[in-house]
Design a protein with these regions (language model features):
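Conserved alpha/beta-hydrolase catalytic His-Asp/Glu region
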Residues: 129, 144-195
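Conserved HGGG/HGGXW glycine-rich cap/lid loop of the alpha/beta-hydrolase fold
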Residues: 15, 20-70
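Catalytic histidine-centered segment of alpha/beta-hydrolase-like enzymes
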Residues: 234-247
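Flexible "cap/lid" loop of the alpha/beta hydrolase fold
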Residues: 107, 112-143
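Short beta-strand/loop motif that positions the catalytic acidic residue
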Residues: 197, 203-205
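Acidic catalytic loop of the alpha/beta-hydrolase fold
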Residues: 208-212, 237
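Short alpha-helix in the alpha/beta-hydrolase fold that links the catalytic acid
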Residues: 199, 213-222
């Protein structure tokens, strides 16, 4: 399989897309707000069903759109997104590409951060390729067909609706930006930062993830021994294919947290 096909399938101007639903009041025993960092596409448009499922549990939700211009490495993105983190209590949730980005942000100890959720993600390159391979992600390479991406990302859980959402998400972002982010996944390594995470952490793993190299998943589990690790039946795009189940896990875990 071409390297670009392996990488791009992991998964505008800076902005925030949000969906709100009234939750519990400030006297609640646990945080009620979830701030989401989306996957490789960076738009958050693929996450609408999952955010709606969280809202059904009485939570408020917000998805940050990753900036499409400028450096796309995780450290640079973390610096640019820092000012968008709220001062009130919140849970930071990140999937796939944004996992290392969330780690970068969490270890800077935001005032309102009360917990971290990492879904279908990694601490360093998620495929068995050397970091130097990032230079081979030529801008001239074409994007893989949506049908192929859907098979890799969603497997037997793919539907026409999923394929339509995936197609719409990909056309919103410049191809060069997708390639830059894919290259960043080969260079990133936040393993040394994991021990600096000071908030409760939940890790959601997909049992049928065709994108993440199994050793990278095992490594994350080993380096976060105090986190709650939950494996769900589903593909790499776990939050899209199993939105209700994933939201239920997140909501139940959040109820165990201190204010």
């Amino acid at each position: 399989m071409p390297m670009w096909v392996m990488l791009v399938s992991k998964g505008g101007d800076m902005g925030i897309g949000s969906e709100e639903k009234p939750g519990c009041d400030s006297a609640s025993a646990a945080p009620q707000h979830v701030l989401m960092l989306p996957g490789l596409d960076g738009s958050g448009s693929l996450s609408t069903p999952f955010l709606s499922a969280l809202q059904a549990h009485g939570l408020t939700t917000q998805a940050i759109t990753l900036p499409a211009q400028g450096g796309q490495d995780h450290a640079t993105l973390a610096q640019r997104l820092w000012s968008q983190l709220p001062g009130h209590p919140f849970i930071l949730l990140a999937e796939s590409f944004s996992g290392p980005l969330a780690v970068e942000l969490a270890t800077r100890h935001p005032t309102g951060l009360r917990g971290l959720v990492l879904a279908s993600t990694f601490a360093r390159r998620p495929v068995p390729l050397p970091a130097a391979s990032a230079a081979l992600l030529s801008p001239a390479w074409p994007l893989p067909p949506v049908a192929l991406l859907a098979r890799l990302l969603l497997g037997r859980w793919r539907t026409r609706e999923h394929m339509s959402m995936l197609r719409d998400a990909l056309v919103q972002i410049p191809a060069i930006t997708l390639r830059q982010r894919a290259a960043a996944t080969l260079r990133v390594d936040v393993r040394a930062l994991l021990s600096a995470i000071e908030v409760p952490t939940l890790c959601l793993h997909a049992c049928h993830d065709r994108l993440l190299w199994p050793p990278s998943v095992a490594e994350l589990q080993a380096l976060l021994p105090d986190a709650r690790h939950v494996s769900l039946e589903g593909p790499h795009l776990l939050l899209q294919a199993r939105a209700d189940a994933a939201a239920a896990e997140v909501a139940a875990w959040m109820r165990t947290l201190s204010p």
